Amino acid sequence: MNTQLLKRLYSIYSPSGKERKMVKFLCSYIRQLPGDISVSKDKFGNLYVVKGEAETYPCLVSHIDQVSHCNHSKDFKALETREIIFGYSPKNRRFENLGADDKNGVFICLECLKKYDAVKVVFFREEETGCKGSSEAVMSFFDDVRFVIQPDRKGDSDLITSIGYSDLCSEKFIEALEPEKWGYMEENGLMTDILTLKEKGLGVSCINVSCGYYNPHTDEEITVKKDLMKSLLFVEHIIEECTDVYPHTQSDPYFSPYEFEDEIYDMLNYDPTLTPEDLYEMYSTDFPHLRLDDYERICRDYRMLWKEYDEYKLINGNGYENEKVLS
């Protein structure tokens, strides 16, 4: 695995709205790759890359912005052990965010651009602030693609085939992927660029794939190298084996603004002291459709439920004392 390239990507700090250094690096790096490659930019600053000539192309997308709680220190380093990579500032003696979400996806895109003769890639800006980049995508770029892969999921085994109540791909495409053979299982995911593309009318199958990062959006974010390599090999398998076009249109797209409240309730169970402002800061990138007043309502409902439950326990003990034992 090209860890030198990976750590170079981690070293470029690119918070949402400030991706200029990353764009400059990508343009420079891509133009020195072998083959017939063109790079263009839309009005929003998204990068579109075409390599080779073909009737249809495999297509990969990733986003180039990151979320972190502190800026990179001047001495930021991506440190590597046998198993993992993590961000660290020796001077400040603190862990710092890698940006592996989604620079691991960027890495996979670059490796595939280098390896294959015909491929399309898009690098989106500002995914973390509500998929702003992909909402400005030039959709004609996707007219001749067979499918779209986004490596932008934590862990090592998730194959995102739906988001909310919106399916992203066809059953035929899922069968062609052979996910179980490669250690992946279908899951429902969070809002990301491929959902935005589908909502803009993209008519081919899309998936989001785990790519080996953990603890995203925190300063303790890590990459497990073998899990990233597993993702790269899976993506290469798809490119090489899925040579048909896999059409898919959303039958009844629906995205509930309250669908992921259970996850927020779980976080409140873990730390009941969290405020609506804390939750908004933590989840604004995962659930950009939720506003601050939504978090205020969720906190209010949560605390009311637990207050009622505590009062019930005071009156009724553990809740089982007055029940008859049936034999």
Predicted segments with their positions:
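Zn-dependent metallopeptidase/amidohydrolase metal-coordination segment
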Residues: 185-231
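Short secondary-structure junctions
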Residues: 32-41, 78-80, 84, 180-186
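His/Asp/Glu-rich mid-to-C-terminal helical/loop segments that flank catalytic regions of hydrolases
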Residues: 215-278, 315, 319, 324-327
